[in-house]
Amino acid sequence: MIVTNFAYGTGPYLRTTDLAIAFNDELQRNKKPRMRILVPWVYGEKQRRVMLEEFRDYDLGYPGEILLDAELGSMLRRVFYGGGPYRDALEKWTKQCQTVSQETHRHLSGRFEAQTLSGGTVEVNGQDIAVELSRSPRVRYDVAPSYFSSFAYVGEILERASSIALHRVGRDVLRKGVEAANWVEEHQTMRFIAYPATFGYFKTWEPRYPGDSLAPPLVPPTRSNTENIKPGVFVTVTGIPGLERLYAEATRLGIALYSNEHEQVPGSERQSPHVIPNKNILLQFARAGWSSIWISMLAGTPLVIPPFDLDDDPEIHFNNVSVKELELGIIYGGQTLESLIMEGPRLKESYDNIKRRILEKFDTLDGNRYCAKL
């Protein structure tokens, strides 16, 4: 059995599941049996809905292979950032990291129940866990060899954050955060850091731990989308000052608004992120998380991100710098929608150049398959 371990948010649980699927496909290609995939069920029915939307076809082909563990999810939720000032979440994590790690270890070492994506109940024996696949994990399970893949080390992010004044996290809390992150991150069997990613704008890459390797973007290749939709903008981030004006401008220009959270975007139509590669999606508005950044880059759909909020995770500050320096998107600063759309050709050319460099280095754009083979 494979167990996944990830950070807060939607992208991490989707992308670790993608990696687990790639791992299983590689096992099958080598004539070895596939393994069940145990996913922490952190976000309740919303997570199940999102995973069904993302992996419906896969679940039909391999029914019951993906399992959701609510008890494990509730443990991770206690150390996750879930809104409010990041400093509060960081302080909570530093205090509970080792305690929650011990709890997850005990849980995963025994017998427990999990659910299939379709809602069936399955009894699981933790002794069957053979491998852990993690993405920027916040705890240690210590039940099987752990394979780490991420956009950066949290320990390095917090170390570098202590030297800038662009956030509201005290140095003492940052220091404790570095200690907690190092305790988790140094205990990994194999490690991959993606390119481009959080510190991709550095001129040279230096491994943090012996055996560190670079990998292509840790998302599946985007699939073409030919749905007949009106020209529009896909919105995956809300609550940013000024976006309401852009929504009104879109209406005036006859440009549609699409979102997977359409209740939070006035006048929008609900669509899955799978439409982002559609030629009629003119822009994607998203927080600077790497799932969104890589999807825009691979799809060739220009990305617009909000400026860094001083109360947010310092990772986002460095992500924004990388997006700007590598020409992966535009930081929103009150521009008109028309001016943002006009930046599209420049960004698409930049995306093509970056993809060419990735292919020259790795011979693939698919970081999950790349890591699974190693």
Give names to the regions the model predicted.
Residues 102-137:
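Short N-terminal targeting/anchoring amphipathic segment
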Residues 4-18:
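A short, glycine/small-residue-rich beta-strand->loop->alpha-helix junction that serves as a flexible
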